Swiss-Prot record:
C(6)C(4)C(9)C(6)CC repeat residue intervals: 27-64, 65-101, 102-139, 140-177
Purpose: Lethal toxin which possesses an inhibitory effect on direct electrical stimulation of the isolated hemi-diaphragm of mice. Neither hemorrhagic nor hemolytic activities are detected. Phospholipase A2 activity, proteolytic activity and arginine esterolytic activity are absent.
Originating species: Heloderma suspectum cinctum
Molecular function as annotated in GO: toxin activity
Designated name of the protein: Helofensin-2
UniProt keywords, alphabetically: Repeat, Secreted, Signal, Toxin
GO biological process, one term: defense response
Signal peptide: 1-26
């Protein structure tokens, strides 16, 4: 008879652990905890994690990374000034800061450059940054671009008569192209 009561008590205890303890309203289900980028752990959280609530099992806590750890895992940095147009916003950090990560494609294009496919286009040169692995960020090479358009880099376009300025080779040096006769 005593073994029957002990058996019932053990089974009841297991049932409480697996189905939630009555009176823990407001506690997270496992799915709710996961939706908050957390996990239900028994009593203690892993290092660098914080308790963000209770799970609906007795003695379990919903643990998640700190905002700084979450940001670092996404290769971002927490900044108080907010994200720029060339950043990807990964959400809030502590103290009103934002988790920002430079988007290499946006950054390359924002500065007037292009992303090459394996290599830069003929009239461009790589600038040492990558849009993504195997895709260099390429800057237009003024002299090569000028030459590809049939022009010449000259300090004074008046050396070619008649002439049009069709671009810039470098600071202060125009790309000059002779006008075609309209005969």
């Amino acid at each position: 008879m005593q073994m029957d009561w002990l058996f019932i008590a053990v089974i009841s205890g297991i049932g409480l652990l697996s189905s939630g303890v009555p009176g823990t309203q407001g506690a997270y289900t496992t799915e709710q905890c996961r939706a908050l980028n957390g996990s239900c752990n028994f009593y203690a959280c892993f290092p660098k994690n914080v308790i963000i609530g209770k799970c609906d099992w007795w003695g379990w806590s919903c643990c998640a990374r700190t905002p700084l750890e979450r940001c670092t895992a996404k290769k971002g940095t927490c900044t108080k000034t907010g994200c720029t147009k060339t950043d990807t916003d990964h959400g809030p950090c502590d103290g009103g800061a934002q988790c920002c990560q430079r988007d290499p494609v946006k950054y390359c294009k924002f500065h007037g450059n292009v992303c090459g496919r394996g290599k830069c286009p003929m009239d461009h040169i790589p600038i040492g940054e990558q849009c993504m692995p195997g895709y260099p960020c390429c800057k237009r090479d003024g002299p090569a671009y000028c030459k590809s358009k049939g022009g010449k880099c000259l300090r004074r376009c008046s050396q070619i008569v008649p002439t049009d300025i069709i671009g810039v080779c470098a600071d202060g040096v125009p790309c000059c192209k002779s006008r075609q006769s309209t005969g």
